[in-house]
Amino acid sequence: MTRYVFITGGVVSSLGKGIASASLGALLQARGYSVRLRKLDPYLNVDPGTMSPYQHGEVFVTDDGAETDLDLGHYERFTGVHATKSDNATTGRIYSEVIARERRGDYLGATVQVIPHITDAIKQAILRETAGLDFVLVEIGGTVGDIESLPFLEAIRQLGNELGPHDAMFVHLTLVPYIPSAGELKTKPTQHSVKELLNVGIQPHMLICRCDRPIPEGERRKIALFCNVRPEAVVPALDVGTIYEVPISYHEAGLDREVLRHFGLPHDAEPDLGRWRRIVETVRNPEGEVTIAVVGKYTNLLDSYKSLGEALTHGGIANRVRVRLDWVDSEIFEQPGAVARLDGVHGILVPGGFGERGTGGKIEAVRFARERHVPFLGICFGMQMAVIEAARNLAGLPGASSTEFGPCEVPVVGLLTEWARGNEIERRAAEGDLGGTMRLGAYAATLVEGSLVRAVYGDAATIEERHRHRYEVNIHYRERLESAGLRFSGLSPDGLLPEIVEYPDHPWFIGVQYHPELKSKPFDPHPLFAGFIEAAVKQMRLV
């Protein structure tokens, strides 16, 4: 029997519904239950793939090629359960599906309305592919009271009634702010937020209250009284030093016990939180510190690189060091001598991105890492910049560039619209809906024997990683570039697409066409990030 937990948020945005959902999933897993997490986003975009990183933050790509909300990254990192395209639905996608059905005549001439047609489609999205699971946790994006959220709230209200209280639970995340002038925590915002939920017919069974200090017992009982929940169901969510401490903090506050009590399940035994305690201990008590310069385009909003920042932290956990990130706008390196800012860093990372702006600075950062023997990791666009730098400065091809920036004399990076996926040829068209010409999702790569990257992957001959890009390194320049010293150490199974490059005579220099950060977890750091930080530790001891 599958049980559903619906997580909503109120008062203000950015309270951490994604972390709360992921933490509850981790706690239920620690008690032996199977879980799946889903996110419903109330915006009209079909998916976040075409949204500006400054508007939305990172686009998290799943194995099956879905471009999804960054919260799905939290779900995967906390639970280890790989998300799919079924785990993220937007208003745009729901409306597109309903309109397509109406055009096909599926509704038999009925007047198509928000209720029941849109709400039914939302319920179908929630219930899809859940057989055999113990728990499905569904996060509703946005803030209660927003007009955009109303169809989703109505859908989960209906679903709560249809499933019944033994199979459905409503959890509401709110803010209990501290007012310095009054010297006390204020419960009124939470009361009003719950009132908004009641206006749409939802009575929450539990409140998670974000606060920066403990909630006095009297205030906790006051919240319970006015919001019509048990005092034990008012769960304080205190600020902690690292997000990986949240599952422990929530358990100590009674979150998982109260959820199990609601469903009539055993809740007295202690969950196994050993791996979370070990992670927190390592983060709190590192044996050293390394500085990594992240030379990117969207550094003004760090959510644009959410998975990347977490993956670097995971690399630090694997090596028992703190990773200090120096976020650098690549455009500054287009000024003469500015690249000297990288003196003293222990590693340089150039992440993914799109467009020509800032590419000159990224190429300068690549050159600095190559010439100074500083550990380097280039991801997606970062690998392409490494190839262009090698072509211009080592292979005698000063006109080398990418066709992404316009026509060029030496297109060492270009657009491909078809490639092999398994035994089939996959084609993308610019007018298509799913990313257009984007190469999305998990693809295999073969690693060259004796290469650094093969050693990093534990001598694996074949790997599978997630991609999100339109442009590819041109295989026709392989011989020229390898003669100049840049080794093509990973290729697509058909040998036509360069996936990994490295310098054999460099202490640690790897560029990858895929996004390894999307598969890294705190309890299972990705080998590339563990290896990169290990190389940075060695660099730290040299300088």
Swiss-Prot record:
L-glutamine binds at residues 54, 353, 381-384, 404, 470. InterPro entries: Class_I_gatase-like, CTP_synthase, CTP_synthase_N, GATASE, GATase1_CTP_Synthase, P-loop_NTPase. GO terms for cellular component: cytosol. ATP binds at residues 14-19, 71, 240. Residues 291-542 form the Glutamine amidotransferase type-1 domain. CTP binds at residues 13, 146-148, 186-191, 222. It catalyses: UTP + L-glutamine + ATP + H2O = CTP + L-glutamate + ADP + phosphate + 2 H(+); L-glutamine + H2O = L-glutamate + NH4(+); UTP + NH4(+) + ATP = CTP + ADP + phosphate + 2 H(+). Allosterically activated by GTP, when glutamine is the substrate; GTP has no effect on the reaction when ammonia is the substrate. The allosteric effector GTP functions by stabilizing the protein conformation that binds the tetrahedral intermediate(s) formed during glutamine hydrolysis. Inhibited by the product CTP, via allosteric rather than competitive inhibition. This is CTP synthase. It comes from Acidiphilium cryptum (strain JF-5).
